[in-house]
Design a protein with these regions (language model features):
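C-terminal lobe and adjacent flexible extensions of AdoMet/dcAdoMet transferase-like proteins
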Residues: 94-142
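A short glycine-rich, Lys/Arg-flanked "PGG" loop and its adjoining helix->strand segment in the class I
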Residues: 40-55
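A short SAM/SAH-binding and catalytic strip from SAM-dependent methyltransferases
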Residues: 14, 25-38
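A short acidic, Gly/Pro-enriched loop at the edge of an enzyme's catalytic core
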Residues: 5, 15-26
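Helix-to-beta-strand junctions that scaffold the AdoMet/dcAdoMet cofactor pocket
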Residues: 3, 35-37, 50-52
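Short, conserved SAM-binding/catalytic segment
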Residues: 1-7
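Class I S-adenosylmethionine-dependent transferase superfamily signal
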Residues: 31, 45-47, 95
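Short, glycine-/aromatic-enriched active-site segment of Class I SAM-dependent methyltransferases
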Residues: 62-82
Length: 142
């Protein structure tokens, strides 16, 4: 809308990005990956489309401990971005498996209170398990 010719927005599934291999400088994602049932595929496809040296910049929720079944299986909590959160360790493992380097996962503990209020009556203890986080990674140079 502002006439920038160096930015492109595309609509597609996060597990199957409608972008050519090695063509993107950066991928930005805000609170979406936790909703995917196949997070490894998300990170693998992000790696595929990034140019060597390309960056992944994510803001999402991560679990600081394994989620109890009642949180994982609650549809309200799943759709509220709580029930599908991967642990910090699992997120790092998936990024490494996809091929990323220079991985940083920076939890924001101050988000716990807000997350506990997302689904009134249901997410009261969600902040005990889930926090917002900045996730950064780089596709290595060839």
């Amino acid at each position: 809308k502002i006439g920038a010719n160096t930015v492109e927005f595309r609509l597609g599934e996060i597990e199957h990005l409608p972008v050519a291999d090695n063509s993107a400088d950066i991928i930005m994602s805000n609170c979406v990956i936790n909703l995917s049932p196949d997070k490894q595929k998300v990170y693998g496809d992000a790696f595929r489309v990034l140019k060597p040296g390309g960056r992944l910049a994510i803001s999402d929720v991560v679990a600081t401990a394994p989620l109890p079944d009642e949180i994982q299986q609650d549809l309200a909590l799943l759709s509220a971005c709580v029930g599908g959160a991967a642990t910090i360790d699992d997120t790092e493992r998936m990024l490494v498996k996809a091929g990323f380097q220079n991985i940083e996962i920076i939890p924001k503990d101050e988000s716990r209170k807000l997350i506990s209020e997302w689904v009134p009556g249901k997410s009261k203890n969600a902040g005990d398990y889930v926090v917002a986080a900045y996730i950064k990674a780089v596709k290595p140079l060839l």
